């Protein structure tokens, strides 16, 4: 595994993980735009991630797609690749790479907390771990999502005549906020900006 120009790259089989520029073969961990780009010859990813890419970039955003189920092994020469749930967003995956009895895991973006909008994180045994660390510092302590949603609902009840605007990424967090509201029996109408609405009303499956 090489790290060239801020990209993970397996040189002897010309395979990139989440490359930012068009490549011959790209394994995509999830559908967020900083990981999933258009223009690759061959994209390997979960079916949900491929669907998201097609919604965002069009059906011809790659020349070839290989959808993999979680736990399904895919081989390129003497390398074996298996995707496992990352718990980040719908279709997100960790990548297990096996060669000569060595197991390397690339996490991609991941979340270990429970989230009903995607398959939850699965711990994968490995010899080498390459991890995303967006919130890796100890100063990042995320509160319980249900407590935060309860704060929002209380505020709505207290301030009935005021509009409440919740900022969230269109893909992933917006769906999670809506799901958490419904879990807490908040059944009032929710208005969304165009981006989450376009994703929700598309052919994209609602669960992983």
What is the role of each PLM region?
Residues 191-208:
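Single conserved hydrophobic/aromatic residue that forms the stacking wall/gate
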Residues 175-180:
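A short acidic (Asp/Glu
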Residues 2-10, 16-21, 25, 31-163, ...:
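His/Asp/Glu-rich metal-coordinating catalytic cores
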Residues 183-189:
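Structural alpha-beta junctions
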Residues 66-69, 189-193:
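Beta-strand->loop->alpha-helix junctions that form or flank phosphate-binding loops
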Residues 172-173, 197:
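Short, catalytically relevant binding-site loops at active-site mouths
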């Amino acid at each position: 595994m090489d790290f060239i120009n801020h990209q993970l790259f397996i040189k002897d089989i010309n395979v990139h993980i989440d490359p930012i520029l068009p490549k011959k073969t790209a394994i995509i961990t999830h559908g967020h735009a900083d990981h999933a780009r258009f223009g690759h010859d061959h994209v390997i990813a979960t079916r949900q991630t491929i669907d998201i890419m097609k919604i965002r970039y069009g059906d011809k955003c790659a020349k070839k797609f290989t959808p993999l189920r979680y736990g399904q092994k895919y081989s390129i020469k003497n390398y074996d690749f298996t995707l496992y749930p990352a718990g980040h967003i719908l279709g997100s995956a960790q990548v297990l790479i096996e060669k000569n009895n060595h197991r390397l895991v690339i996490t991609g973006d991941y979340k270990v907390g429970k989230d009903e909008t995607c398959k939850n994180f699965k711990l994968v045994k490995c010899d080498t771990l390459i991890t995303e660390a967006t919130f890796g510092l100890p100063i990042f302590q995320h509160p319980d999502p249900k407590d935060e949603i309860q704060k929002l609902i209380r505020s709505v009840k207290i301030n009935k005549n005021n509009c409440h605007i919740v900022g969230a990424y269109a893909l992933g967090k917006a769906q999670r906020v809506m799901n958490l509201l419904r879990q807490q029996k908040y059944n009032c109408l929710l208005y969304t900006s165009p981006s989450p609405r376009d994703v929700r009303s598309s052919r994209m499956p609602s669960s992983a």
